[in-house]
């Protein structure tokens, strides 16, 4: 069994949301950095920073909650394309999550982008995950 970096990151964020944790720590790779930038830009996380200890670098996400009950902004994170079953889509067939409320994160020839950017640039790719 190989390492699925995206699934590990999604699981860490999901578990932290369930426990109402302030921060989450995930290994830093180019892929996780790019996904973190998208989550920050779309308003799903408060911020993130990169730290290094003993040649191991990792990202620390500060999660975003709303209201007195501290409901998480990220209600669902779902991995779509998996190492055993890759899912690809052209720009015309990219699914809309919750009628456009959520986002689809794609890996394209132009980098890691959201579904809106992919439609705008008319580029398809591998559907990594849904966020809403």
UniProtKB/Swiss-Prot annotation:
Localization: Plastid, Chloroplast
A GO cellular component annotation in the UniProt record: ribonucleoprotein complex
Name of this protein: Small ribosomal subunit protein uS8c
Function: One of the primary rRNA binding proteins, it binds directly to 16S rRNA central domain where it helps coordinate assembly of the platform of the 30S subunit.
InterPro entries documented for this protein: Ribosomal_uS8 (IPR000630), Ribosomal_uS8_CS (IPR047863), Ribosomal_uS8_sf (IPR035987)
Listed PANTHER family: 40S RIBOSOMAL PROTEIN S15A (PTHR11758)
Quaternary structure annotation from Swiss-Prot or TrEMBL: Part of the 30S ribosomal subunit.
Keywords for the protein's UniProt record, in alphabetical order: Chloroplast, Plastid, Ribonucleoprotein, Ribosomal protein, RNA-binding, rRNA-binding
One term of GO molecular function: rRNA binding
Family classification: Belongs to the universal ribosomal protein uS8 family.
């Amino acid at each position: 069994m190989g390492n699925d970096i995206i699934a590990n990151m999604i699981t860490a964020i999901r578990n932290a949301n369930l426990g109402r944790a302030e921060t989450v720590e995930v290994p830093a790779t180019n892929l996780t950095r790019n996904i973190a930038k998208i989550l920050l830009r779309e308003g799903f996380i408060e911020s993130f920073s990169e730290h290094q200890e003993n040649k191991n670098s990792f990202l620390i996400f500060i999660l975003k909650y709303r209201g007195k009950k501290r409901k998480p902004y990220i209600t669902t994170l779902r991995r779509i394309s998996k190492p055993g079953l890759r899912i690809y889509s052209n720009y015309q067939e990219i699914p809309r999550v919750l009628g456009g409320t959520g986002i689809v994160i794609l890996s394209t020839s132009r980098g890691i982008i959201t579904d809106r950017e992919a439609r705008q640039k008319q580029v398809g790719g591998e559907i990594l995950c849904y966020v809403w």
